[in-house]
A protein has these predicted regions:
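Positively charged n-region of N-terminal signal peptides that target proteins for export
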Residues: 1-6
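Bacterial N-terminal signal peptides
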Residues: 8-19
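Non-catalytic accessory regions flanking glycosidase/transglycosidase catalytic cores in CAZymes
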Residues: 23-246, 252-260, 284-323, 329-527
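Active-site His/acidic residue clusters
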Residues: 264-280
Length: 527
């Protein structure tokens, strides 16, 4: 009898081992450099600055603070921003832009206004030229949004003239009078923000938005033919909305006019369900594929000359749910979200998704840069890097070149039915892989990015090279911590990038154990 019991006990243990991702019996990643997805655009490593809370005032701009330079910019913030290797920064909004009039924020006399999007007073001490000084100091590029809400198409045209025309017309000369003899040469301009949202000042239906956007685009391009234009795609995924219909209309009507369509997503974990939360980036990827299908359909009849097809710009994305009450969305300290490890893993998955969809996702902007749902957090005496800073920095500094179509075999799980965020529809995700993977190659240098979604188990994985051989040491960077709820704070960097010992690799395969609840970046060569 005891013998039989022991037999059954060992059989049970073996069955658990055989299916457990912690022991990784079937975890495989295959890298084939012939299976390419598209060129990775550096603009997926963008960010966003809006006049909201302490993002601008008390964030990037803090005149009189001992930590600020002669122009009022926080030196510690600029150094942290440089570490993110930001490709471009979107400005000035966001909801803010739909009641923003750029002339209020240039020249020696600034106009103080009621700021209606986020319920505060806007002094306009910081405007176009201050922002351009900031991006030049940080070493990045600007991306401006024009006011398609309360603004006019003429106002949009005049802003392009002010920024991009060297001399001659009134607004170019006005810029010179303001002390800036050379044009700023701003390449990227979006035609409004979230215009399908009922919360947007000057909200329009799709047909009326397209009429206004088309005429604004006409005037803006006549002023500077070299600019790139981004249309406002849907941001309204509430149960009674039809975001795909909005996107279909915008792409159909503006298919000959714009270069990108902008999409937004914010996710959260209000129900404290780790596995549901870690599946939310799959929704972004599914929406990407639906929108790509709409683009492909309408590009068949487009007249674009030698311009490429419309691309997707995820120009707002982040985790945002704690600071989303009416009280926490208004005033000086609005949207001050404090992030933990599980949030950082979701950000890494978003970035994996952008890389996997490199053929169509050519821009992405984390919202926002400082204090407001941001990777950088300040007070008057210092700053710290939030958990979400580290995966973004790793991707921006290491992942470039050509995206590869990676084969992944590992255990999976199913989610419950859940809301991915406030104002979102419900989803159920099936067969969610515990390993979320992307890979890129540039000049024979391979980068493999892996999130282990498993909360408790490390996953032992065989990594195979289908063409060529892995060669030389692999550098390994890991973002992890003692607990999925671990956070950073002033003087407490509990979650950060850890450089692990190099892995000596030679041949067609190697094995790596991905720790539980971790993001790992491996970087080596293929010969």
């Amino acid at each position: 009898m005891n013998y039989i019991v022991r037999i059954f006990a060992w059989a049970l243990i073996w069955s658990l081992i055989s299916v457990s991702p912690g022991f990784g019996q079937n975890a495989i990643i295959k890298i084939d450099t012939d299976r390419t997805l598209g060129e990775i655009d550096r603009n997926i490593y963008g960010n966003f600055v809006e006049h909201l809370g302490r993002c601008v005032y008390g964030g990037i701009y803090d005149p009189g603070n001992p930590l600020s330079d002669e122009d009022g910019f926080r030196k510690d913030v600029m150094e942290a921003a440089k570490g993110l290797n930001i490709a471009l920064i979107r400005y000035p909004g966001g909801n803010f832009v739909s009641n923003y009039h750029w002339l209020d924020g240039v020249g020696p006399e600034r106009t103080t206004r009621m700021e209606l999007a986020w319920s505060r007073i806007e002094t306009n001490f910081f405007g176009t030229n201050e922002f351009m000084k900031f991006v030049r100091k940080v070493g990045t590029e600007p991306y401006f949004s024009v006011n398609m809400g309360t603004g006019t198409i003429e106002e949009a045209q005049r802003w392009v003239e002010y920024c991009n025309v060297k001399d001659g017309p009134y607004y170019a000369e006005l810029r010179k009078k303001h002390g800036y003899p050379e044009p700023w040469g701003i390449k990227y301009w979006s035609l409004g923000n979230e215009m399908d949202g009922f919360w947007q000042m000057g909200h329009l239906n799709a047909e009326d938005y397209c009429k206004k956007a088309r005429e604004a685009a006409k005037l803006m391009r006549l002023t500077d033919p070299n600019i790139k234009l981004i249309a406002a795609g849907s941001s309204n995924y509430r149960p009674n909305a039809d975001p795909d219909e909005w996107n279909e209309t915008v792409i159909r009507e503006l298919r000959d006019v714009v270069d990108y369509i902008a999409l937004h997503i914010y996710v959260g974990n209000p129900d404290n369900n780790y596995y549901n939360f870690l599946a939310t980036p799959l929704v972004l990827e599914q929406r990407t594929k639906v929108t790509k299908g709409i683009i492909d359909k309408h590009m068949q009849k487009a007249h674009r000359g030698n311009r490429p097809p419309i691309y997707i710009a995820w120009d707002e994305y982040n985790v945002w749910y704690r600071a989303r009450t009416d009280e926490s969305m208004q005033g000086t300290r609005a949207l001050e979200e404090h992030y933990n490890l599980e949030d950082a893993l979701v950000i890494a998955e978003f970035l994996n998704a952008f890389v996997r969809n490199a053929d169509v996702v050519k821009m992405a902007n984390m919202a926002q840069l400082v204090n407001v749902i941001a990777p950088i957090f300040t007070n008057e005496k210092g700053m710290f890097r939030q958990t979400i800073y580290f995966p973004l920095a790793l991707f921006a500094n290491h992942v470039a070149g050509t995206s590869l179509d990676v084969f992944v075999k590992c255990d999976t799980y199913d989610t419950d039915e859940f809301f991915i965020g406030l104002g979102e529809s419900k989803t159920v995700q099936k067969n969610v892989p515990y390993l979320d993977v992307s890979a890129a190659i540039k000049n024979n240098e391979i980068v493999i990015c892996v999130v282990n979604r498993h909360k408790d188990k490390p996953i032992t994985t065989e990594i195979l090279c289908q063409k060529g051989l892995f060669s030389g040491p692999f550098k390994i960077y890991e973002v992890n911590g003692p607990d999925i709820k671990a956070m950073n704070d002033f003087g407490q960097e509990n979650i950060k990038t850890q450089t692990k010992p190099e892995l000596k690799v030679k041949g067609s395969s190697f094995t790596y154990i991905f720790p539980a609840h971790s993001f790992t970046l491996l970087k080596g060569k293929i010969e």
